[in-house]
UniProtKB/Swiss-Prot annotation:
The UniProt record lists the keyword Transit peptide: no
Pfam families recorded: IGPS
Record bears the keyword Lyase: yes
Catalytic activity: 1-(2-carboxyphenylamino)-1-deoxy-D-ribulose 5-phosphate + H(+) = (1S,2R)-1-C-(indol-3-yl)glycerol 3-phosphate + CO2 + H2O
Protein name (database record): Indole-3-glycerol phosphate synthase
Coiled coil feature spans: none
Pathway, per record: Amino-acid biosynthesis; L-tryptophan biosynthesis; L-tryptophan from chorismate: step 4/5
Record-listed E.C. numbers: 4.1.1.48
C-alpha cells in the first residue's frame, strides 16, 4: 500500500510537536492493513443512549493516563488494575494512551487493558499512519481516535481504514471548522475536545456549543464530551446533548479510580 502522510506542517504548537514525533516514529512502517475484519461496534453500542436517557445520564469513557503535557506526571497506574477499577466504577468503555513521550503510554499498556477489561477499549494516540490503526486492531482495541486537527481533509481516508479493520472511530474536533469537516465525512461517533491542543487551554463551553451545532445539522450519532471534567457540576451543560464523557486526569490522579468514576456521574 502506497501511503503519504498528512501535511503536519500546518499543525501548530504543542500538538504540532507531538504529531511530528509520531510521524517520524512510523515513517518507515508497513502501511498495509491486512485482511478486512468484521465490525463489532461494541464501542459505539456501549456509549449510545436513547433520546430519553440522554438527558438523564452519561456513559463514561475512563482513561488510563500516566502523564500529560499540561499536568506532567499524573499517576503510576497499573493498566490492568486501572481497567478493572474503572469497570467496577461503572465505566462503559476505557481509553488507553499509547503515546510514550508525553503521556507515558505504551503498546503493553493497551494490551494489558484489553486483557483485563470486559468493556470496549479505545486506542488513544495521535494517528498519522495506517500502521497505527492496524496495531489497534491487532492489540484488541475496539476503537481508535482520529483527530481532525491532525488529519484535516484526509479524515475520510482514515475513516475508511478503520472500517476495513472493523474498528469504531472516535472523530475528534475542537472548533466549528473542524466540526464541518467531520460532519461531511459521516462519522458515527463524534468527540468534542474542550482543550485546544495547540495551547493546552480548556474551555468547557466548547462541548455544549459544538454539540448543539452538530445536532442542529442533523447528526444523530454518538456525541462525546472530552477534557476538563473534574466534578459532576462540570457536566451540567452537556446532559441532554452528549451520550458520553471521556475523562482522564481527574480520574487517573484520584487515588480511588472506582470511587472517582462513580462520584463523577452522580446526580
Amino acid at each position: 500500500m502506497t501511503f503519504s502522510p498528512p501535511d503536519l506542517s500546518r499543525v501548530p504548537g504543542v500538538l504540532g510537536r507531538i504529531v511530528t514525533e509520531r510521524e517520524a516514529d512510523y515513517r518507515n512502517a508497513d502501511a498495509s492493513l491486512g485482511e478486512a475484519r468484521a465490525p463489532h461496534r461494541r464501542f459505539e453500542q456501549a456509549l449510545r443512549l436513547s433520546p430519553d436517557d440522554r438527558g438523564a445520564r452519561l456513559a463514561l469513557i475512563a482513561e488510563v493516563k500516566q502523564a500529560s503535557p499540561s499536568e506532567g506526571a499524573i499517576a503510576a497506574l497499573d493498566p490492568a488494575q486501572a481497567a478493572r477499577a474503572y469497570a467496577e466504577g461503572g465505566a462503559a468503555a476505557i481509553s488507553c494512551l499509547t503515546e510514550p513521550r508525553h503521556f507515558g503510554g505504551s503498546p503493553e499498556a493497551l494490551r494489558a487493558v484489553v486483557a483485563a477489561s470486559e468493556v470496549p477499549v479505545l486506542r488513544k494516540d495521535f494517528v498519522v499512519h495506517p500502521a497505527m490503526l492496524r496495531e489497534a486492531a491487532e492489540w484488541g482495541a475496539g476503537a481508535a481516535l482520529l483527530m481532525v486537527s491532525v488529519l484535516g481533509e484526509r479524515l475520510p481516508e482514515f475513516l475508511a481504514m478503520t472500517e476495513h479493520l472493523g474498528l469504531d472511530a472516535l472523530v475528534e474536533v475542537h472548533d466549528e471548522r473542524e466540526l464541518d469537516i467531520a460532519l461531511a465525512a459521516g462519522p458515527r461517533i463524534l468527540g468534542i475536545n474542550n482543550r485546544d491542543l495547540t495551547t493546552l487551554k480548556i474551555d468547557l463551553g466548547v462541548s455544549p456549543h459544538l454539540m448543539a451545532r452538530a445536532r442542529a445539522a442533523g447528526f444523530s450519532g454518538v456525541l462525546v464530551a472530552e477534557s476538563g471534567y473534574r466534578a459532576p457540576a462540570d457536566l451540567r451543560e452537556v446532559y441532554g446533548l452528549a451520550d458520553a464523557v471521556l475523562v482522564g486526569t481527574s480520574l487517573a490522579g484520584s487515588g480511588d479510580l472506582a470511587g472517582a468514576a462513580r462520584a463523577l456521574l452522580a446526580r
